[in-house]
Design a protein with these regions (language model features):
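Short, surface-exposed loop or secondary-structure junction motifs
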Residues: 1-174
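Short acidic, gly/pro-rich beta-turn/loop elements at beta-sheet edges
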Residues: 140, 172, 202, 211-212
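Residue-level detector of beta-strand structural context in well-folded domains
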Residues: 160, 188-190
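Short, structured beta-strand/loop micro-motifs enriched in basic residues and often containing a Trp
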Residues: 181
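Short, small/polar residue-rich loop motifs at catalytic or cofactor-binding pockets
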Residues: 184-186
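Short, well-ordered beta-strand elements
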Residues: 190-192, 197-206
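Generic C-terminus detector
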Residues: 207-230
Length: 230
């Protein structure tokens, strides 16, 4: 289908990674290191965990509903974790390992309009375009094709790589219209609030969590604000 006709939660970001390789003539991982990670000082972000940093690579956890307790997925004995030791595919849609501080540096670049650490990564107009909602009412589950984000997160639209908060009331948690965010399967989450000029990062390694940790984090973060910019 043509752009603007439908919306599909797909492997488009992986395709974008391949396009970057073709245009730049560089392997995707090397392009990211040269143009994003190194300029921002993100020294702990990579597809493949270096041998001298494996002791810092945290294991994932899972919720054992039957036992009512957390279980640990050992790094070497879990395929999802051991894949980060020897990487053959550098995916544009996932697979990077990072740290909270590195991710904060990346988020600060976004919050600052595309610049951080003396490096210009993106233009302010590009950031604005990426963090605006690109879904129209016609692109809904009932009229325009697949829209799992709207079904899973009421009040949320979609930009270029970000979920965009359109109506905080419909999201059923505290926040600001215009927040842009995303999360991971094991509970990792970040969002940037342009209204309150705030970044929130949650590094959680828990698959199948029975708790609504993202909403709890949002409530805790926003209840700590005593003077709002709204």
């Amino acid at each position: 289908y043509k752009p603007g006709e439908r919306w599909h939660y797909s492997v488009a970001v992986d395709v974008t990674g391949l396009v970057i390789e073709r245009i730049s003539g560089m392997p995707f991982d090397q392009y990211l290191e040269k143009n994003i990670f190194a300029p921002l000082g993100m020294d702990d972000t990579f597809f493949e965990v270096p041998e001298d940093k494996t002791d810092r690579f945290l294991p994932n956890h899972f919720w054992n509903a039957k036992a009512g307790e957390l279980g640990t997925m050992p790094v070497q004995n879990n395929t999802a974790m051991s894949d980060y030791m020897t990487v053959s595919l550098h995916s544009g849609g996932g697979g990077l390992v990072s740290s909270t501080m590195d991710y904060m540096r990346f988020c600060e670049m976004l919050r600052n309009g595309g610049t951080f650490n003396g490096a210009r990564i993106l233009s302010p107009k590009t950031i604005k375009f990426m963090t605006s909602n690109h879904l129209t009412k016609s692109l809904s589950a009932s009229t325009g094709g697949e829209d799992p984000i709207a079904a899973a997160f009421p009040g949320v639209g979609f930009g270029l790589g970000f979920g965009i908060t359109l109506d905080p009331v419909l999201t059923q948690t505290l926040g600001s219209a215009g927040n842009y965010s995303w999360g991971g399967a094991a509970g990792t989450v970040f969002w940037i609030d342009p209204v309150e000029d705030m970044i929130v990062i949650g590094m959680i390694q828990l698959m199948g969590s029975p708790w609504n940790l993202r909403q709890d984090l949002g409530i805790a973060a926003y209840q700590s604000i005593l003077e709002t910019n709204e």
